[in-house]
UniProtKB/Swiss-Prot annotation:
Residues 321-335 have a biased composition (Basic residues). Its main location: cytoplasm. It comes from Kluyveromyces lactis (strain ATCC 8585 / CBS 2359 / DSM 70799 / NBRC 1267 / NRRL Y-1140 / WM37) (Yeast). It is found in: Cytoplasm, Cytoskeleton, Spindle pole. Residues 203-225, 296-335 are annotated as: Disordered. This is Protein IBD2. The lineage of its organism: Eukaryota, Fungi, Dikarya, Ascomycota, Saccharomycotina. The gene is IBD2.
Amino acid sequence: MGNGNASIEFVSENGPIDFSVMMQEGVKALTKILSTHLQDNPDLINEKSMKVIFKDNNGKLEPVFAPSEGNSGLINGNDQDENYDEDRDIEEANEDYEVIEFDNEGNYHVCAKGTQNRAIGYDEKVYSKSEHYADSTDTHDYDEDGIINEDNNQLLPKDKWNGHMTRLKNGAISSAEHEVVFEHDNGDNTTFSPAETINDGHMDKRDRSHMHHSGHSEKTGGSCACQENKDSFKYPDHVPNSAPNFRALLQHTVNGKQMCPFCEYYVVFGTPPAYIMRWASSKISAEHSQYKMNDQIVDGDSGDMDRNLDSVETNEMNKQQTKKKKKKSKRKSKR
């Protein structure tokens, strides 16, 4: 049996042995190999190829490990050093570990000595950051981007916003244009701004319903970089089907303030976040329906409510009278 280049050979000195015993001993031997440093030192796999010789020692089968002939030479019978593997394991357990600093400061990895080249790359070449970004564009899958964009476009709310998708895809837009206007069936229009919705998350339901019913939300100017100096703030031009540009998050940070999630998504990927739009559409529609239902309850006929209360009281009185009659009938039956 074998594992890659690590192989185990079974030899019995006392004739055939039971198959189950052979498999059990083989599993133990393979576990011994895998528990050592084969994963950290692939060059030593060949040295770990071994021969297992079963000897009859007072009725018990005892495996004796011996290096294979092709790697460590022949070791004769009883002159074999049984402590060979144990000494190697002790040396590896006591091996010093060092901290290797990579190209990106702040990322530290603990690696055993001699594994630095494999951690950086199998071709032992250190790439610079500029080379890394250049290579990433060459291997970009443009077909996959097209499929993702088509799926996202299908999730957008239909007939709920007024042509903002076209302006978002065509390049630079002003920060005010990322607001989406949703049209309701009753003719009311609601302007959705992701930055305002997130920053107003601490308000209770009553305040949010009141603001929604009024048809607009108060501006929270200065809360995000994209809301500060809205007239002068411009989104960067984004080449279609290009790799995500995460550096834009640092380039468009104004006075230590980050952009809203909507703008961050756009400057990185070059497309509007379809899932945020879908969530906003469903949330606003649900709140609008709930508020309309509450208005109907408040504006309901007070006479109808009084009649409902009277009917409830009448039913309660009838139940009590029925209980009293049952108690009287039970008393009479006992007498």
